[in-house]
Curated annotation (Swiss-Prot):
UMP binds at G58, D78, T139, G140, N141, P142, F143, C144, T145, T146. Its EC number is 2.7.4.22. One of its GO terms (cellular component) is cytosol. Disulfide bonds: none annotated. It holds the Pfam family AA_kinase. Pathway: Pyrimidine metabolism; CTP biosynthesis via de novo pathway; UDP from UMP (UMPK route): step 1/1. Keywords: ATP-binding, Cytoplasm, Kinase, Nucleotide-binding, Pyrimidine biosynthesis, Transferase. The keyword Transferase applies. This is Uridylate kinase.
């Protein structure tokens, strides 16, 4: 374990955790053993001296875009999806605090009874005090994904890198679950991700990351300890940069 924070390349990071990552092998909801493992991985990174922020998705509970396809108003469906991210954020906070990780949930949609509203300066101050900040509610606007929220929050918090935790160990030229010959990229440019329509993040999120020179690293959250390894340039991952 690195004791000198100055030895680390990335000292402030944002972790994007999908809702699907929280449900493990279930079809819906939460798998608490999986969430506890993720919380343990986060604690390992905190112990390195790294400042950590998190954006959590809501796809394990509700997907606004899917609901809109069957007739629900898209904006209303997206707001319901934002509420799903709040459920996940509070669940993750509870598990993390059981491991003695100081955590604050800040929501883009004010819910004063359960968490703080998102205020950029307050969020940065929490991170300076070594608290983990979980951003809920996406961007607070419909028609925006939680990937876009992750990129925006990473930029606002002046993070060195965005880590996207997924079910696969990087970015491939096709779905490795369907194509055994899929090629994995070690590094790939923002432009190539967009041009090749690679399904790692939505185009808007990649475009904003590119404009602000925010590197993105995609890795698998399924293997314990991967988060700490990846921010130290170890393990399996793909880096998206210029």
């Amino acid at each position: 374990m690195i004791s000198d924070i100055n030895a680390l390349k990335y000292k402030k990071v944002l972790l994007k955790v999908s809702g699907e990552a929280l449900m493990g092998d279930k079809q819906f909801g939460h798998e608490y053993d999986v969430i506890k493992k993720i919380a343990g991985d986060i604690k390992e990174v905190i112990n390195l001296g790294v400042e950590v922020a998190i954006v959590v998705g809501g796809g394990n509970i509700y997907r606004g875009i899917n609901a809109s396809l069957v007739g629900m108003d898209r904006a209303s469906a997206d707001y319901i999806g934002m509420l799903a991210t709040m459920i996940n954020a509070l669940t993750l906070q509870n598990v993390m605090e059981s491991l003695n990780i100081y955590t604050r949930v800040l929501s883009a949609i004010p819910m004063m009874s359960v968490c703080e509203p998102y205020i950029r300066r307050k969020a940065k101050r929490h991170m300076e005090k070594k608290r983990v900040v979980i951003f809920a509610g996406g961007t607070g606007n419909p028609f925006c994904t939680t990937d876009s929220a992750a990129v925006l929050r990473a930029i606002e918090m002046n993070c060195d890198i965005l880590l996207k935790a997924t079910q696969v160990d990087g970015v491939y030229d096709s779905d490795p679950k369907k194509n055994p010959d899929a090629k994995k990229y070690f590094t790939i440019s923002y432009k190539d991700v967009i041009t090749n329509s690679l399904q790692v993040m939505d185009t808007a999120a990649i475009a904003v990351a590119r404009e602000n020179k925010l590197p993105i690293r995609v890795f698998s959250i399924k293997e314990q300890g991967n988060f700490a390894r990846v921010i130290q340039d170890k393990g399996e991952y793909t880096t998206i940069e210029e």
